[in-house]
């Protein structure tokens, strides 16, 4: 049996949000992701993978939640489960750091790990409200 190894990527994410203090609506205006995974073999594929992961993470960060009552799932259909819509997708900026000096590594959905913390920190910066559980604003943000 051969030996295993792991080489992952490095990611940093920045979020810019707009908060309507009257309605409590939070809108992510921009997501910037910088990603390094060694030598980039397929730049278009990598960009698509990163942008898709960021949109997926946007839903989990803001409003995706399974609702329960008495041990039963209340929103078991996609018509009752809030997913990101085209109108939710912010401006996406992707910075791919191509390191020809090191071997390629897998990307997968690695970029999704930074999205929720970046959005939570942007909401805190805008409002002073620190949110610590996901989804961050399933029913709007309560701001004094």
Regions found by a protein language model. Give the residues of each.
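C-terminal catalytic domains of large/alpha subunits in multi-subunit enzymes
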Residues: 2-144
């Amino acid at each position: 049996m051969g030996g295993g190894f792991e080489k992952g990527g490095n990611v940093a994410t920045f979020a810019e949000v707009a908060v309507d203090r009257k309605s409590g609506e939070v809108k992510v205006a921009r997501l910037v992701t910088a990603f390094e995974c060694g030598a980039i073999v397929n730049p278009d594929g990598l960009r698509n993978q990163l942008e898709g992961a960021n949109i997926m993470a946007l839903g989990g960060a803001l409003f995706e939640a399974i609702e329960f009552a008495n041990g039963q799932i209340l929103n078991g259909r996609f018509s009752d489960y809030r997913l990101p819509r085209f109108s939710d997708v912010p401006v996406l900026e992707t910075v791919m750091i191509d390191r020809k000096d090191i071997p390629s590594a897998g990307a997968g959905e690695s970029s999704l790990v930074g999205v929720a913390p970046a959005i939570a920190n942007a909401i805190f910066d805008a409002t002073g409200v620190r949110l610590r559980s996901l989804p961050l604003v399933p029913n709007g943000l309560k701001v004094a």
